[in-house]
């Protein structure tokens, strides 16, 4: 991808990067491992963004 990006695209990519994380450990501990994965996780090669 080009190094010079429009600001809107850069913000969308940053938001997608921040949302692509595991749930916090305190959530896993509080739910007694009932919640261990996030349904919004995305792999960079398998699923592409519409950004």
UniProtKB/Swiss-Prot annotation:
It comes from Pyrobaculum calidifontis (strain DSM 21063 / JCM 11548 / VA1). This is Large ribosomal subunit protein eL39. SUPFAM superfamilies: Ribosomal protein L39e. PROSITE patterns: RIBOSOMAL_L39E. One of its GO terms (molecular function) is structural constituent of ribosome. GO terms for cellular component: ribonucleoprotein complex; ribosome. Coiled coil: none annotated. GO terms for biological process: translation. Belongs to the eukaryotic ribosomal protein eL39 family. Pfam families: Ribosomal_L39. Keywords: Ribonucleoprotein, Ribosomal protein. Residues 32-51 are annotated as: Disordered. HAMAP family: Ribosomal_eL39. InterPro entries: Ribosomal_eL39, Ribosomal_eL39_CS, Ribosomal_eL39_dom_sf. Signal peptide: none annotated.
